């Protein structure tokens, strides 16, 4: 699943199809809400495994999709995160995803949806009311429904950091600090309040069904 937040004028999809000789369905979302763009793509996916990719990001291995598919041959794998790199055009900062406490409140050590994959039958939609907490809200609901994700230790994808990236543009909306013993982070108070209202029981007792 490839998601583009901009209108393509360079026939990129046609060139990809010609180079790799495979068929794909191109669904064009006509609106201007990035979250709805992703949900539209998700709702049209027909394969067994969904691997989101965005126009900002790239695979770092020719065998990335093969490695991801291998993970789903393991018994019980419903969704998975892979190792990733944050790339600024010059250097790679490589990381392995970690599910930290207070992930739902923005302590995101898992990275963007570029690093995640999941079975089609297990998917959730992204919440259109969120922007800064869009990804962690999705991860939270996925874990509540499907349990703890598998972690693929291989570095398979790169998040390309640049000023036009949606997450970079959203930093101007930070207006509060969430405190944590291992380091504080900035967040948007309205989105944080929305999350607290959406999951009141979890905020009181932050425990997942897969935790003993």
State each model region's role.
Residues 1-28:
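Acidic donor-binding segment of Leloir-type glycosyltransferases
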Residues 28-45:
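Glycine-rich, basic loop-to-helix element that forms the pyrophosphate-binding segment
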Residues 22, 45-48, 65:
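Active-site acidic short loop of glycosyltransferases
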Residues 11-12, 38, 61-68, 138, ...:
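Acidic donor-diphosphate engagement hotspot in glycosyltransferases and nucleotidyltransferases
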Residues 82, 99-185:
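Conserved nucleotide-sugar donor-binding catalytic segment
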Residues 47-58:
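Short beta-strand-to-loop acidic/aromatic patch adjacent to the donor-nucleotide binding site
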Residues 6-7, 57-59:
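Acidic metal-phosphate-binding loop of nucleotide-sugar-dependent transferases
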């Amino acid at each position: 699943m490839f998601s583009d937040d901009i209108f393509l004028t360079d026939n990129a999809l046609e060139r990809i199809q010609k180079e790799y000789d495979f068929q794909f369905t191109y669904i064009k979302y006509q609106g201007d809400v990035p979250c709805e763009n992703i949900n539209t793509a998700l709702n049209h996916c027909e394969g067994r495994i969904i691997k989101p990719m965005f126009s900002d990001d790239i695979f770092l291995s020719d065998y990335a999709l093969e490695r991801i598919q291998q993970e789903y041959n393991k018994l019980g794998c419903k969704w998975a995160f892979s190792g990733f790199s944050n790339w600024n055009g010059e250097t790679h900062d490589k990381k392995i995803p970690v599910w930290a406490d207070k992930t739902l409140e923005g302590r995101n050590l898992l990275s963007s949806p570029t690093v995640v994959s999941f079975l089609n039958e297990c998917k959730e939609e992204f919440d259109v009311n969120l922007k800064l907490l869009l990804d962690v809200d999705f991860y939270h609901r996925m874990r509540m429904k499907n349990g703890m994700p598998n972690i693929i230790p291989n570095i398979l994808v790169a998040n390309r950091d640049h000023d036009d990236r949606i997450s970079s543009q959203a930093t101007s909306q930070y207006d509060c600090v969430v405190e944590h013993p291992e380091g504080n982070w900035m967040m948007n108070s309205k989105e944080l309040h929305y999350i607290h209202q959406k999951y009141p029981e979890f905020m009181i007792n932050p425990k997942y069904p897969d935790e003993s």
